[in-house]
């Protein structure tokens, strides 16, 4: 099983790549963490936000592996505690399907794309900058794995 984060945006600061790589390399191969960056639609084209999100959605769809469980990160998504995320991770691993987390661009994710997802979650009630979302998501996925592995990283 892979945990795949498909995120609109590229050219992240070096600290984001460093943090991402650190958490990704900590996870075992049977729970690998992978990032797929999607080129954002240029914001200078005169297109509406809906048109830009639709264009990004087409790129996102092309990056999603067949048969994967799809979860959209959205401000109106379901809150999960760290323990609940670890329980979900356990279920996902038992199911064997890849799990894809979709992170939208500056305008979010296209409504049709969100509707096609198996669920929607949010990382926080606070608004987080996109670079921080990647780091927080990677850390929480690692923490969820650490809980299941009884690793001392998470001390409840």
From Swiss-Prot:
Subunit text: Homodimer.
GO MF term (any one): rRNA (pseudouridine-N3-)-methyltransferase activity
Recorded catalytic activity of this chain's protein: pseudouridine(1915) in 23S rRNA + S-adenosyl-L-methionine = N(3)-methylpseudouridine(1915) in 23S rRNA + S-adenosyl-L-homocysteine + H(+)
Keyword Nuclease (UniProt): no
Protein name: Ribosomal RNA large subunit methyltransferase H
UniProt keywords, alphabetically: Cytoplasm, Methyltransferase, rRNA processing, S-adenosyl-L-methionine, Transferase
Transmembrane portions of the chain: none
Organism of derivation: Bordetella petrii (strain ATCC BAA-461 / DSM 12804 / CCUG 43448)
């Amino acid at each position: 099983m892979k945990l795949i984060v498909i995120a609109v945006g590229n050219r992240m600061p070096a600290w984001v790549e460093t943090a991402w790589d650190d958490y990704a390399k900590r996870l075992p191969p049977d729970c690998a963490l992978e990032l797929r960056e999607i080129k954002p639609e240029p914001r200078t084209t005169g297109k509406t936000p809906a048109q830009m999100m639709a264009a990004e959605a087409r790129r996102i769809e092309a990056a999603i592996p067949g048969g994967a469980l799809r979860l959209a990160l959205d401000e109106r998504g379901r809150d999960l505690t760290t323990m609940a995320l670890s329980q979900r991770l356990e279920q996902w691993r038992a199911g064997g399907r890849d799990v894809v987390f979709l992170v939208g661009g500056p305008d979010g994710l296209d409504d049709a794309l969100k509707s096609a997802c198996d669920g929607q979650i949010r990382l926080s009630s606070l608004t987080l900058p996109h670079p921080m979302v990647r780091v927080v998501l990677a850390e929480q996925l690692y923490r969820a794995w650490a809980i299941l592995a009884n690793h001392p990283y998470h001390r409840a």
